[in-house]
A protein has these predicted regions:
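Acyl-donor (CoA/ACP) binding surface of acyl/acetyltransferases
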Residues: 5-57, 95-206
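An amphipathic alpha-helix signature
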Residues: 48-55, 75, 79, 83
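Generic structural signal for alpha-helix termini and adjacent loop/cap motifs
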Residues: 61, 85, 147-148
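Conserved GNAT-fold acetyl-CoA-binding loop/helix
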Residues: 62-82
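A short helix-loop-beta-strand connector motif used in the catalytic cores of GNAT acetyltransferases and
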Residues: 82-94, 103
């Protein structure tokens, strides 16, 4: 499985969002992960005590491959990121398997005339790809974000065209494929095409 192109939440120095009060609610869903083993996928705020779990996926080049950020090599840099970017972020959650963080997901809001739109980003530890976990996490966000942010009418996700796995995740979560944005971003030294996906508040929940 491939992961989403993550627009902002791992990007060092990004400050495109307008801070809001942080939400502390805890979302849960029970799902089957292989065979008959039932596990809980939950979303919760990520904090400094999660640094060791964070480093597992944030230092992995396979995870960072499709994202705007390079794999972390310094625990100090990762702690600084969590303290100064994650904790103040208006909607950033750890994706947890049985309470243990294995990835992260965020919604970054726009401001001004664009406040009706938000941008989804996510990353998941490589060993958990292909198990339906990312799809479950995206569904959890999609089923609650519009009620949490009444101004939000559209949730977008941008994915590299070669990132077929993440495109499947979004489609399974109810997002619509809108088209290709050609030569849309310079990513890791190369100009890349992105696929735009969207979910609007009036779409039926999946």
């Amino acid at each position: 499985m491939s992961l989403s192109f993550v627009p902002h939440f791992f990007q060092q120095g990004s400050n495109s969002y307008k801070p809001l009060l942080k939400h502390s609610h805890h979302q849960e869903v029970t799902m089957e992960v292989g065979g008959n083993e039932f596990t809980e996928i939950t979303l919760r705020p990520l904090d400094l005590s999660d640094i060791d779990a964070f480093m597992v996926w944030a230092t992995d080049d396979k995870v960072a491959r499709f994202c705007t950020w390079d794999a972390y090599t310094s625990k100090a840099d990762a702690l600084d990121f969590i303290k100064n970017k994650v904790i103040p972020h208006p909607w950033f959650r750890a994706i947890c398997l049985n309470g243990q963080p294995i990835g992260a997901i965020s919604v970054t809001r726009n401001i001004g005339n664009d406040e009706c739109r938000g941008e989804l980003g996510y990353a998941l530890g490589y060993k958990y790809w292909g198990k339906g976990i990312a799809t479950k996490a995206v569904k959890l966000v999609a089923n609650t974000i519009f009620s949490e942010w009444p101004h939000l009418e559209r949730l977008e996700a941008l994915v590299l065209v070669e990132n077929v796995g993440s495109q499947r995740v979004l489609e399974k979560a109810g997002f619509q494929r809108e088209g290709v944005l050609r030569k849309y971003i310079t990513l890791k030294g190369k100009t890349r095409d992105l696929m735009m996906f969207s979910l609007v508040s009036t779409d039926p929940q999946s």
